[in-house]
Amino acid sequence: MACPWKFLFRAKFHQYGMKEEKDINNNVEKPPGATPSPSTQDDLKNHKHHNDSPQPLTETVQKLPESLDKLHATPLSRPQHVRIKNWGNGMTFQDTLHHKAKGDLACKSKSCLGAIMNPKSLTREPRDKPTPPDELLPQAIEFVNQYYSSFKEAKIEEHLARVEAVTKEIETTGTYQLTGDELIFATKQAWRNAPRCIGRIQWSNLQVFDARSCSTAKEMFEHICRHLRYASNNGNIRSAITVFPQRTDGKHDFRVWNAQLIRYAGYQMPDGTILGDPASVEFTQLCIDLGWKPKYGRFDVVPLVLQADGQDPEFFEIPPDLVLEVPMEHPKYEWFRELELKWYALPAVANMLLEVGGLEFPGCPFNGWYMGTEIGVRDFCDVQRYNILEEVGRRMGLETHKLASLWKDRAVIEINVAVLHSFQKQNVTIMDHHSAAESFMKYMQSEYRSRGGCPADWIWLVPPISGSITPVFHQEMLNYVLSPFYYYQVEAWKTHVWQDEKRRPQRRKIQLKVLVKAVLFASMLMRKTMASRVRVTILFATETGKSETLARDLGALFSCAFHPKVLCMDEYKLSHLEEEQLLLVVTSTFGNGDSPGNGEKLKKSLFMLKELTNKFRYAVFGLGSSMYPQFCAFAHDIDHKLSHLGASQLTPGGEGDELNGKEEAFRCWAVQTFKAACDTSDVRGKHCIQIPRLYTSNVTWDPHHYRLLQDSQPLDLNKALSKMHAKNVFTLRLKSQRNLQSPISNRTTLQVELSCEDSQELSYLPGEHLGVFPGNQLALVQGILERVVYSPAPLQPVHLETLSERGSYWVRNNRLPPCSLSQALTYFLDITTPPTHLLLRKLAQLAHQYAERHRLEILCHPSEYNKWKLTNSPTFLEVLEEFPSLRVSAGFLLSQLPILKPRYYSISSSRDCTPMEVHLTVAVLVYPTRDGQGPLHHGVCSTWLSNLKPQDPVPCFVRSAGNFKLPEDPSRPCILIGPGTGIAPFRSFWQQRLHDIKHKGLRGSRMTLVFGCRRPDEDHLYREEMLEMAQSGVLHEVHTAYSRLPGQPKVYVQDILRQQLASQVLRMLHEEQGHLYVCGDVRMARDVAHTLKHLVAAKLSLSEEQVEDYFFQLKSQKRYHEDIFGAVFPYEVKKDGAAKQPSDPRVPAAHGRS
């Protein structure tokens, strides 16, 4: 029998000299011979291992053999180390683990091959005979030593017995078999040792499927199906590996021929183009040669090609239910869906070889989960892959013909945003590259502490975008191969010995693509001066993305003199307040004075905080609409709380009103805050700092910087609106409309029926919104056209150009599409909203009479402006009439007037009930000005809709309503609360429920409707339909609150809840896990919420804080739904900018502004 002891007791790492020095890996001084204490991890099948690499057997067994005792003795010398440094933070590590590396890498003395994709040193060639026993034995014993050294408690007898058993097995059979636990240990260690993997922090969580007993390709397929089902896990991806039988003589291999278990086909078309994934062209043709029938689509999943026991391969179609795919969409660009992109959720590498203890497993498919850039950069943007970069750039309106415009960078970022958004929307596991890089740095530090090294390939670990703004970029790394290890293999079809020559694929000449031969390292090292600057944290919370945009603009401003960091509130740790120097907050207010969704967590933690020891400086800017009574409420709450905690306010809080020039207000506040910060921080050279042009742009109008040129391009309204607003705009046509109010009412509420016969691909869910792009009134447009000077013909298409910053050339302005001035004023420009301060200041330049110019300048002051705006609420035409000496050019209008925004309406129909129609419920808005003495003003969209004739086009798009949708479980009870046009989405709810009952056999749970209006004979919208739904059992209860019944007290929806439904509401919410929906005016929603909280607090004996937490949980569980809108009538806005309570605060408002 061969002697194993010379391999077991080899202690080659004792050969180096030792000197006393600081242990940099653990950052503490240690006495000579001290070893790091091991970390523990979960045990593998009832026995625990160290996180450490193999250590000597511990001294827990008495009377060890002398030679074995030497193995455990404290080493008299410390291994030589390689020092590696992180150039970002200065931290250094000492790598000693590389002394256990196996073999040499690809580098030569005069040339580095580190950028070679598949170097020979990382590739295992096929064998035609078994590994000789004298080569296998030392590797086997070394692995057994490694395995038993990983236990927390030594198992000396078991260890020695296993060594003898392996030795005897090799001597008898020429090979040996791993135990199940050894296989699990080996696969995890191989992942831990993989230098090109950035996600190794999860190495200990790998699920191992032992498939070494299978013998046929069909059995292999069944194992892989099990693997796919487990790993996909409905989107909650789990890392897993399936290990097929080990290699014997190289002639009976079990292999998966696919590069990945799931991959899309690539078809070489007759004209030389490629349809699908170009990376799969060769393999796809192989599948076709084996008998697979191609589908010739862009995203066809290729079959699995499996080889068992060295036999010719067989192919198997993967069942569609095992292929989880994610359709791509963008959170802002609706047109991104038109690209019709998708990607599979599971990245499962299938063609690598596992080497462990001299054994080779050529079939071992494994998976983790995606890092976003793998799809968004490599799969979608690489020129040799789907290569969508230029198309996306063009759709974004970027200058794709100029490299210096950085269009590629901007486009690739948005593609990656789309990938992350799409995966997250579908609840599929994915990690962004910044988080992945951060997690690797934590893993690397842990590895150096636990085992003195971490093999890492810098070229592979630095993400393909973001470069030096990821921490791995600045980290020196040492690359080497340990055992166990995952090796590359030569493609199976290139080396397979065919038994049936008729099945051998014909050899084809493969066209070689142009390969990228070098990796360009861009970006400078981080400037050392940043470390000496004052740190500034900028937090934002947002629902629409506007606060984030402004926060990042603020970061750009403060980066001129400070060290800013911009974070979303849900990414911020409250404990960091104790370390802040300067904190800036930019946030919107959502709903009824609440925080945006991504600010809820911080709000709750901050408001529970009692005190701060760090008295930092802060400033807050709030965004909102003064049409809401809780204008900028969340920003004010944060301001007051920080002040209460003892923080020092740097500048007064700022407010940005969506109805009154929020961008100008933000710029003024930002510059004021920046100057104050420079003063308090004593910034050197603060008077010479050049701040971004955004904050220094001239507020004056210079007509020489703009010009109009004739254009021959006809206007495509849908395409133009799609590009301007980043929406997928389509055309519906008016079918009919009827007034839902009775003849005795002096108000109008329309049921608008739109035909979607020309847009049959239209899809929406009950509760979602229809965004409508209206046209301005013809009288307003004509009145402005009559007062314009220096104008082309009203119907002549033109486009706008602006002078470059240096004044040397003209640049096409893409703010508006090529169109006539008449078209611009009708469809693209807002001519009804009162002009902002900034626009009035520019108009003052154009007044030819001194008195008018002086009056306009006075109106730029906030107090005068607010009084004038609230009294007159002037349209742009009325401004021209009030100041007749104004000489306004077409260039001024096209460049300075604000963009006309879409109006949103809840869809009042079910797609299943009316597949060819979309219904809206629209209150036609008419209101007086100048305290009733001025002209009547009309809502833009509601008036436009009311004037349409049958078959007139309506440009629109569908907007998701978030969580405002029917429960996924139809057995959950619902209470629907919607006065006035707040009934709109609930009509779609009851139509959908009626359809499900009739056609799907579903019996939904109790649905209770609480409606409110003035009188039953005046404005009870959809009254007959409600009665029908009640009689058919769709609505189990209908309660109506009438607020204008003669001789009776006013009753509102909250009164119904308090007086008639208190017990039912509590039972539904607290016991039956039901859903409650509120739709309508923000003041009504506030009163309803207050009533509900009072009822719950009284019934459950909760404190004010407890009941707030109770409703916070309801919203978190997506069981309390709100779809609310602000005040509609401008005269209801107070001078201080907040919406006031009208004489009847509960009068139903129009659903959807104007």
Curated annotation (Swiss-Prot):
Tell me what PTMs the record reports for this protein: Polyubiquitinated; mediated by SPSB1, SPSB2 and SPSB4, leading to proteasomal degradation.
Q: How is its activity regulated?
A: Regulated by calcium/calmodulin.
Catalysed reactions, as listed in the record: 2 L-arginine + 3 NADPH + 4 O2 + H(+) = 2 L-citrulline + 2 nitric oxide + 3 NADP(+) + 4 H2O
Q: Which GO terms describe its biological process?
A: arginine catabolic process; defense response to bacterium; inflammatory response; negative regulation of blood pressure; nitric oxide biosynthetic process; nitric oxide mediated signal transduction; peptidyl-cysteine S-nitrosylation; positive regulation of interleukin-6 production
Gene Ontology CC: one annotated term: nucleus
Quote the function comment for this protein: Produces nitric oxide (NO) which is a messenger molecule with diverse functions throughout the body. In macrophages, NO mediates tumoricidal and bactericidal actions. Also has nitrosylase activity and mediates cysteine S-nitrosylation of cytoplasmic target proteins such PTGS2/COX2. As component of the iNOS-S100A8/9 transnitrosylase complex involved in the selective inflammatory stimulus-dependent S-nitrosylation of GAPDH implicated in regulation of the GAIT complex activity and probably multiple targets including ANXA5, EZR, MSN and VIM.
Return the protein name: Nitric oxide synthase, inducible
The organism's taxonomic lineage, starting at the top? Eukaryota, Metazoa, Chordata, Craniata, Vertebrata
Designated gene of the protein: NOS2
